[in-house]
Amino acid sequence: MKILVVLPNFEGGGAERIHVNLANEWAKSGHEVIFCALEKKGPLINLIDQKIKVIDLDCKRILFSLNPLIKNIRAIKPQKIVAAMWPVTTVTILAKLLSGSQSKIFLVEHCAYEKIFAKLLGHSLFSIGLSKTLSYIFANKLISVSNGVENSIKKITILPNKKFKVIYNGIPIPKNLKKNK
């Protein structure tokens, strides 16, 4: 299976690390994994499996990533798309729709959306909720890393419950702790 993972960059945040770990595991399981990063920067690049291709969209602003994402989705033809962190998630949904792709798309939310967080982002909860409601309806699943994150998104959106799934952040198991087969 061909999986496209869309992230803003590879800076040291927990969300980015989880997606690098997941991508590495998918690659080890025989899947073809490709990253599309708005900016190919950050220390986590060094943790990416050599089998994984990393595409640098070279976009300093998220909105400017729309056309490069459309082109890459068309060229790559992934079966699955995984995008993390709003507003990258919303732009990825738009790119998928405009590309004409039949890929299944999964959006991953790592942050609880409260007034103080929205203020830090420079947006109102209303505008965040509206953009999520209008775009996330087209996702196959909206994955939240905790019940708290899921509940915060449900408060600011009008999305059916069947769209939501909580999958807690995984942690990689060190090789010396894995059972021998």
Which residues fall in each region the model found?
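Membrane-interface segments of envelope glycosyltransferases acting on lipid-linked substrates or membrane lipids
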Residues: 1-181
